[in-house]
């Protein structure tokens, strides 16, 4: 058992991380209601001996913290910028490397939002990489990364199916998470 797995165990967290070790993969992670989600995600991925990059708002990438986040796989994102340029950049990045796993929070914020971002799905359509569904459930202290979502190309149907998957999970701050109406 490595140090990350031990830390999770000491704090009473369980982990079910059973997805195959794909050379390239997106891990869609929800609910995202606290900065602790990042720490738990890092512990989870490292406890199974893997690495994952992650998207994070650019305001976190100030010196010296920015050096740390970039060293562990952080990709700064300028919030509010629309138009697909991030998706295009990530597609080029994925196409230029042999291996890359990227964790993405579709809510794009820790605040309560009904409309999730769809860039990760557009990215999956363009690259053909698998989309793993990762969930952090605070009441049960359980992290689940065991489902692979097969995108159909219908962005609305795909997003509805993904949101439905997360219905049974509760974030650290439950009032900050919703998948929308039933």
Model region roles, listed by residue range:
Residues 1, 9-168, 173, 180-182:
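Soluble catalytic domains of membrane acyltransferases
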